[in-house]
């Protein structure tokens, strides 16, 4: 059932790593909610900075936050002012010492989250859903994707009956665990209601980390 399951969840521990890396016993639920608040705050504050994902690591009374973004200049601000203000706000939110790392996404057209959000924004601006999907597919293939599949669901073009339409190019092997598949969803708020956007991008094969370690030892 590789077609149904979230491709990232299926590959965690094989070729993908967790986005929250910490261990807790009694206060697990509190820390989990804290993670959600941190992510929610960052995504709201940096909604125009093309943030793809936020990784959180914890050690004692310290929180390390890694922000993956296509526009690092926007996150850092003039002379680092914006990132310092963000660090202080997160320290106040968590009550812990916060350290922020910023990682630039070199090819935003190969990042499923950014592609999905781009399609959603276009749908909100009344661009044809077919055109928005086809343009995203062309850009991803030009950027070096091995395959891409996009899907939009809802009242497309203001139709009375909701439906789903998908377009794809290349291959997207969802069953192959060593296939590096990025997957993301986004929502477009249109005058007719919400339209859901899903994007799968196949970026090539990756050897599982265990195999890499074994080969290194030989």
UniProtKB/Swiss-Prot annotation:
Source taxon at top rank: Bacteria
Any Gene Ontology CC annotation: cytosolic small ribosomal subunit
Positions of transmembrane segments: none
InterPro entries reported for this sequence: KH_dom, KH_dom-like_a/b, KH_dom_type_2, KH_sf_prok-type, Ribosomal_S3_C_sf, Ribosomal_uS3_bac-typ, Ribosomal_uS3_C, Ribosomal_uS3_CS
Entry annotated with the keyword Metal-binding: no
This protein's UniProt keywords: Ribonucleoprotein, Ribosomal protein, RNA-binding, rRNA-binding
Signal peptide: none
KH type-2 domain: residues covered: 38-106
Annotated SUPFAM superfamilies: Prokaryotic type KH domain (KH-domain type II), Ribosomal protein S3 C-terminal domain
GO molecular function, one term: mRNA binding
Function: Binds the lower part of the 30S subunit head. Binds mRNA in the 70S ribosome, positioning it for translation.
Family: Belongs to the universal ribosomal protein uS3 family.
Subunit and interaction comment: Part of the 30S ribosomal subunit. Forms a tight complex with proteins S10 and S14.
HAMAP family: Ribosomal_uS3_B
Protein name: Small ribosomal subunit protein uS3
Native organism: Geobacillus thermodenitrificans (strain NG80-2)
Gene name as annotated: rpsC
């Amino acid at each position: 059932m590789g077609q149904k399951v979230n491709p990232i969840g299926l590959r965690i521990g094989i070729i993908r790593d967790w986005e929250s890396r910490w261990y807790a016993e009694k206060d697990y639920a509190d820390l989990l909610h804290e993670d959600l608040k941190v992510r929610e705050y960052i995504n709201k504050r940096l909604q125009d900075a093309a943030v793809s994902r936020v990784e959180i690591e914890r050690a004692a009374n310290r929180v390390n936050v890694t922000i993956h973004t296509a526009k690092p200049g926007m996150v850092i601000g003039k002379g680092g002012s914006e990132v310092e203000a963000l660090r202080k706000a997160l320290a106040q939110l968590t009550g812990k010492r916060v350290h922020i790392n910023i990682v630039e996404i070199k090819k935003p057209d190969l990042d499923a989250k950014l592609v999905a959000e781009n399609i959603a924004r276009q749908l909100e601006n009344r661009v044809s859903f077919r055109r928005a999907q086809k343009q995203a597919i062309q850009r991803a293939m030009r950027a070096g994707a091995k395959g891409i599949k996009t899907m939009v669901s809802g009242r497309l073009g203001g139709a009375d009956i909701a439906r789903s339409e998908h377009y794809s190019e290349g291959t997207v092997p969802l069953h192959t665990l060593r296939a590096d598949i990025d997957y993301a969803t986004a929502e477009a708020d249109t005058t007719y209601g919400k339209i859901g956007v899903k994007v799968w991008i196949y970026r090539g094969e990756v050897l599982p980390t265990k195999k890499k370690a074994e080969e290194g030892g030989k």
